[in-house]
């Protein structure tokens, strides 16, 4: 039986089409995925992301533990509330999950991990935390709502108390603050400004309704996927998994190689991959008619004249740009163009950086 978030009833009242998403009943859309997508790019939309897992870590050695557990280095976190994106890797350098870490105090950090990997993540974290005497608290008492879009912060702020408005005033991207009963973070998965707001489960339905009244459009998983793909953001299980290195998933920037004497899980394997060479994640753009879909083959001829083949990890029609875009994992050496096999047709595509839209504007 699929689980329901505390907002399940609100979704049905808003006319959602519900689907089973990794064991959770979640809204796919509320009538028009396209309208929801455009609302986030031009105004304000909101997503129930309560299926994600918030994990609080307490203990005097928490920073030391996270420096070993994660490929990115929490030594960078010195300002209260600052957030960091990282891969959590296995010994062979594969990605167990990608997550966000918030720093509050030396003995209090918060992780936000994916729903699809919840049990695996908790088991891995618990196993490796034992020698560090970390107190692990899974915050199933909290719901999480993402409010995203150019007008999202302004509209969300109409629900805040004076204390909460003051707490978020001037807050830079990738920070979080606890203000009253809300944890408000300037993070998201759309390429737009906004907040991700955690609150007690019993407050979630009223908060959702108030956001609707403030003119924030409910959005489902469908729009969430096209928005994150336009923004060039990875989806676990597609761009990366336990068999795929962050180096092959455009996550090289999340690996803190320095200081060289910091040991973290997967470091040795990554150093070998870096020396030998590895696949890369690129963007693809197809302006001709047709849609780039997941798992379609991508072919190109490298500088030595050798035929090479990669694969589309995520592909869709971009509502913002009006043509098809994709992320693809390919061998090193790809040039500016490639061929994608769509049924019996060989379609030319342009190779770009793996990001297409930022703050509503085309970058590809």
From Swiss-Prot:
An annotated Gene Ontology molecular function: transaminase activity
Covalent S-S links between cysteines: none
InterPro entries the UniProt entry points to: GCS_T, GCS_T_bac, GCST_C, GCV_T_N, GcvT/YgfZ/DmdA, GcvT/YgfZ_C, TrmE/GcvT_dom1
Entry's Gene Ontology BP terms: glycine decarboxylation via glycine cleavage system
Keywords, alphabetical: Aminotransferase, Transferase
Enzyme Commission designation: 2.1.2.10
The keyword Transferase belongs to this UniProt entry's keyword annotation: yes
Cellular component, GO, one term: glycine cleavage complex
Catalytic reactions on record: N(6)-[(R)-S(8)-aminomethyldihydrolipoyl]-L-lysyl-[protein] + (6S)-5,6,7,8-tetrahydrofolate = N(6)-[(R)-dihydrolipoyl]-L-lysyl-[protein] + (6R)-5,10-methylene-5,6,7,8-tetrahydrofolate + NH4(+)
Superkingdom of the organism of origin: Bacteria
HAMAP family linked to this entry: GcvT (MF_00259)
Function (record text): The glycine cleavage system catalyzes the degradation of glycine.
Similarity annotation: Belongs to the GcvT family.
The protein's assembly and partners: The glycine cleavage system is composed of four proteins: P, T, L and H.
Protein's recorded name: Aminomethyltransferase
Record organism: Salmonella dublin (strain CT_02021853)
Primary gene name: gcvT
